[in-house]
Regions:
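Class I S-adenosyl-L-methionine-dependent methyltransferase module
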Residues: 16-111, 115-116
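Class I S-adenosyl-L-methionine
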Residues: 1-19, 23, 106-127, 131-208
Length: 208
């Protein structure tokens, strides 16, 4: 759930069936498009970036690619990505996405609210929700309380792993790693965060 760029899901090669969900329409259009052979560009100019941002529905697959892959920090149309060394972010993003898609050719990509996803029996669920007190893709603040309530319910019949920085007391961290985040293109605003992987306490004995 909240599959994003699928960087984690693409490495889980031992699963025979994968259902990857995200509520971002253009992201799922991109993933399905690449899966079905859509040819991504090797370069996007700033003028093209601005045009695509203003005409999102002309080519939703391309919009998904440019909106994330050619934007600063991978944030949805968060500004045309550039640096002093002239990195070609479009080519970089294309290479990364195509590499990840090699192991996702049999995956099913769907676009739903996470609560609407039908779960087969005995699922292994990996969720990477927006951080608590953030807006996620849109302007509306993500409701973390509802998500953790959902995670409690889902953990009764499935094993659910949640990537977050913090969690309610009944969720236990089984892994953590510090990362450096950057808020601006000049890398002058950096800060350290610790990413953690949580499971509900009822599932703790199943993952050790």
């Amino acid at each position: 759930m909240f599959c994003g760029s699928c960087s984690v899901e693409s490495k889980l090669t031992f699963f025979t069936k994968k259902i990857l969900n995200d509520k971002h329409e253009y992201l799922i259009e991109l993933l399905n498009g690449v899966k079905n052979g859509y040819e991504l560009p090797d370069y996007i100019s700033e003028e093209q970036y601005k045009y695509i941002r203003a005409h999102k529905d002309e080519d939703k697959i391309l919009t998904g690619f440019v909106g994330f892959g050619c934007s600063f920090g991978g944030k949805w149309f968060g500004g045309y990505a550039r640096n002093k060394t002239g990195t070609n972010y479009a080519a970089q993003s294309k290479k990364s996405l195509l590499k990840d898609m090699v192991t996702l050719q049999e995956a099913e990509f769907i676009c739903k609210d996470y609560r609407e996803v039908v779960l087969p029996e005995n699922c292994i669920i990996y969720a990477d929700p927006p951080y608590d007190n953030t807006t996620g893709y849109g302007k509306e603040k993500f409701n973390s309380k509802k998500f953790w309530d959902y995670a409690r319910d889902a953990s009764q019949n499935h094993i659910m792993f949640i990537s977050e920085q913090t969690a309610p007391e009944d969720f236990i961290s089984i892994w953590e790693k510090p990362f450096t985040r950057t808020l601006d293109v000049n890398k002058s605003n950096q800060f350290q965060v610790t990413e953690k992987l949580f499971v509900h306490k009822n599932n703790l004995n199943l993952v050790k």
